[in-house]
Amino acid sequence: MAERVAESEKITINLGHVDLGHIDLMVQEGFYSNRTDFIRTAIRNQLERHADAAKQAIARKRVELGLRHFSREDLEEVRATGQMLHIRVLGLASIAGDVTPELACATIGSIAVLGALHASSAVKAALLDRIR
């Protein structure tokens, strides 16, 4: 069965009563369909506003953008070459469920993810000192 990858991550934010009231007013007046629509739009607008700075940082830090999946086969190939991966992802990095903690430790030197890392609890625990 194929592994299901979530298309989004749930976050929780705390807002002051006045800010929340303003959001509710915008929703009530029909500018947005709901609070989530307002918050997503605000986030997208801020990301667009800072897009040039983000592009420069991505290039400078040599970060992969988007979804990057590491299969057991990928890591076995890396192990065969004697190399170590230094994973840098902005988005979602996922390590297949059939990757053992031993294989992960033998092939992954470091992980820096701006976004989310999906891996088994055992693999995350084994790599804990390598996750930045």
What is each stretch, according to the model?
Residues 48-80:
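Short, positively charged interaction helices/loops
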Residues 62, 67, 86, 92, ...:
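Detector for repetitive beta-architecture
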Residues 58, 74-85, 97-109, 125-131:
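Short, T/G/N/S-enriched strand-turn elements that build extracellular solenoid repeat scaffolds
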Residues 1-18, 27, 36:
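Short Lys/Arg-rich basic patches
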